[in-house]
């Protein structure tokens, strides 16, 4: 599946998205840009199933992690125009 996962600098380093991901797409990496000194990273996007649990778990109201579904998935879900 060709989904993309974007992590934004609004990440507060809480690890909620990492713990919510059923396929271990996300991991925490060191980053000096926030209080927690870590940020979510998505090194294994090829394993993303598009469930968006990471988005739902994010306490910053979807501002830090976003899953963009691939074209094949949006077509099969009837979301494509």
From Swiss-Prot:
PROSITE patterns: 4FE4S_FER_1 (PS00198), 4FE4S_FER_2 (PS51379). GO terms for cellular component: chloroplast thylakoid membrane; photosystem I. Pfam families: Fer4_7. Apoprotein for the two 4Fe-4S centers FA and FB of photosystem I (PSI); essential for photochemical activity. FB is the terminal electron acceptor of PSI, donating electrons to ferredoxin. The C-terminus interacts with PsaA/B/D and helps assemble the protein into the PSI complex. Required for binding of PsaD and PsaE to PSI. PSI is a plastocyanin-ferredoxin oxidoreductase, converting photonic excitation into a charge separation, which transfers an electron from the donor P700 chlorophyll pair to the spectroscopically characterized acceptors A0, A1, FX, FA and FB in turn. The eukaryotic PSI reaction center is composed of at least 11 subunits. Residues 2-31, 39-68 form the 4Fe-4S ferredoxin-type domain. GO terms for molecular function: 4 iron, 4 sulfur cluster binding; electron transfer activity; metal ion binding; oxidoreductase activity. It comes from Physcomitrium patens (Spreading-leaved earth moss). PANTHER family: PHOTOSYSTEM I IRON-SULFUR CENTER, PHOTOSYSTEM I IRON-SULFUR CENTER-RELATED. Keywords: 4Fe-4S, Chloroplast, Electron transport, Iron, Iron-sulfur, Membrane, Metal-binding, Oxidoreductase, Photosynthesis, Photosystem I, Plastid, Repeat, Thylakoid, Transport. [4Fe-4S] cluster 2 binds at residues 21, 48, 51, 54. Its EC number is 1.97.1.12. It is found in: Plastid, Chloroplast thylakoid membrane. InterPro entries: 4Fe4S_Fe-S-bd (IPR017896), 4Fe4S_Fe_S_CS (IPR017900), PSI_iron-sulfur_center (IPR050157), PSI_PsaC (IPR017491). One of its GO terms (biological process) is photosynthetic electron transport in photosystem I. This is Photosystem I iron-sulfur center. [4Fe-4S] cluster 1 binds at residues 11, 14, 17, 58. Binds 2 [4Fe-4S] clusters. Cluster 2 is most probably the spectroscopically characterized electron acceptor FA and cluster 1 is most probably FB. It catalyses: reduced [plastocyanin] + hnu + oxidized [2Fe-2S]-[ferredoxin] = oxidized [plastocyanin] + reduced [2Fe-2S]-[ferredoxin]. Its cofactor is [4Fe-4S] cluster. It is a peripheral membrane protein.
